[in-house]
From Swiss-Prot:
PROSITE patterns registered for this protein in UniProt: ZF_RING_2
An example molecular function term from Gene Ontology annotations: zinc ion binding
Pathway: Protein modification; protein ubiquitination
Name of this protein: E3 ubiquitin-protein ligase RNF26
Organism name: Mus musculus (Mouse)
Annotated catalysed reactions: S-ubiquitinyl-[E2 ubiquitin-conjugating enzyme]-L-cysteine + [acceptor protein]-L-lysine = [E2 ubiquitin-conjugating enzyme]-L-cysteine + N(6)-ubiquitinyl-[acceptor protein]-L-lysine
Amino acid sequence: MEAVYLVVNGVGLVLDLLTLMLDLNFLLVSSLLATLAWLLAFIYNLPHTVLTSLLHLGRGFLLSLLALVEAVVRFTFGGLQALGTLLYSCYSGLESLKLLGHLASHGALRSREFLNRGILNMVSNGHALLRQACDICAIAMSLVAYVINSLVNICLISTQNFFSLVLALWDAVTGPLWRMTDVVAAFLAHISSSAVAMAILLWTPCQLALELLASAARLLASCVVFHLTGLVLLACVLAVILIVLHPEQTLRLATQALSQLHARPSYHRLWEDIVRLTRLPLGLEAWRRVWSRSLQLASWPNRGGAPGAPQGGPRRVFSARIQPQDTPPEAEEEVIRTAPARGREQLNEDEPAAGQDPWKLLKEQEERKKCVICQDQSKTVLLLPCRHLCLCQACTEILMRHPVYHRNCPLCRRSILQTLNVYL
């Protein structure tokens, strides 16, 4: 057993020895192979490593060089900037000194100027106050005269419009009656002319029937007029009684009636039509005068007379006043614009001849006092702000009805802002 045990131990030792030898062999071979591999890798990577090292070395050198150059440049730029700031501060100080000098000289000049101006203002203050007081008094007097004239004109125009309205209403009421009587008369004349024999035979019954109709019509008309008169008197008495007994209620009823009447659009249309109808005769009469005077001015060279010469004037003016109703507004405006120029040209042409005769000089002076448009009325309206006294009241009203951009002075063509009536 001991021999077997020894054999087994010997075999184990041998195996252990072989294992150790194999491990040593593997360790040596693996170390040798690793060394060879590292050597080959080192040899293979040596150029790249050298180049990379040189590249990093060059890059570091360049960066350090650039940093050095940048530091030098910044130092130089900072020095130059500091020098420029110092120079600019010196220049600013010089400019401030210069500005102070200019300011001192300007202050001295302005103080001297203010002193001179104050002395002049103190000298001229009294004269200016006196002139302003005179101007204020003149303006106040002009405004008072203008207000009084405006009130008088408003009263006259209102009275004229009222009478024109009454005449128009009277014409509107009596016109249909007259036309009806004309139609009845024409109808009766036609019947009488077509049946003369029958009228002769039936004259007595027809006469009786006509007398009966006439008496009935007179009776009916008298009854109607009597009753209407009674109703009107009764209404007047009732109105007076109501006004005396209940003035507040009457005033309230009148106010309500007027408000309801003003609320109706037909009332405004009727009022506008009445105003237009009342203005129409005035406008036609004024345009007739303008047109007749323009025709008279145009016919002066053909007649060979002076302004105001009586040769055939009334007939021509009368015949010319019948036609201007159909003239368009453009022709009327053209007449207004050209009439003063023609009048002035004719007056200038006749001036040498008139200078030799006192009668002609007197006529020329009277013509100069006439309106430059119609040459019929005297100049009574002063145009502002040009201060030309060249128009009458009627022509001024016609001119002021035009748009604002057409309201120009006939002499200087400046815009008319205001008119002032002048009493010579």
